[in-house]
């Protein structure tokens, strides 16, 4: 029972500690938005190629 207050205090201290990024940011890190933009661009290119081949104008 004597350990319970210490345990509660430790939990409160851990919960209120500022969050820190586990690894430092490097020059190779890219924002997630750029990955989404790249994926959208690639999908658009593939859709354009598929539509073109269905019409058989550029195959």
Curated annotation (Swiss-Prot):
Q: Keyword set for this entry?
A: Disulfide bond, Neurotoxin, Secreted, Signal, Toxin
Pro-peptide positions? 23-48
How does it get modified after it is made? Answer: Contains 2 disulfide bonds that can be either 'C1-C3, C2-C4' or 'C1-C4, C2-C3', since these disulfide connectivities have been observed for conotoxins with cysteine framework V (for examples, see AC P0DQQ7 and AC P81755).
Entry annotated with the keyword NADP: no
Query: What is the annotated tissue distribution of the protein whose record heads this document?
Result: Expressed by the venom duct.
Signal peptide range in chain numbering: 1-22
A Pfam family that the UniProt record links to this protein: Chi-conotoxin
Instruction: Tell me where it resides.
Output: Secreted
What do the Gene Ontology cellular component annotations say?
extracellular region
Tell me yes or no: is Disulfide bond among this UniProt entry's keywords.
yes
MF (Gene Ontology): toxin activity
The family annotation for this protein states: Belongs to the conotoxin T superfamily.
Entry comment, domain topic:
The cysteine framework is V (CC-CC).
> What name does the UniProt record give this protein?
Conotoxin mr5a
* Originating organism: Conus marmoreus (Marble cone)
């Amino acid at each position: 029972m004597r350990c319970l207050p210490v345990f509660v205090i430790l939990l409160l201290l851990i919960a209120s500690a500022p969050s820190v990024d586990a690894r430092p940011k490097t020059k190779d890190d890219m924002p997630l938005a750029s990955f989404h933009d790249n994926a959208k661009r690639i999908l658009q290119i593939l859709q354009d190629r598929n539509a073109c081949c269905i019409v058989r104008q550029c195959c």
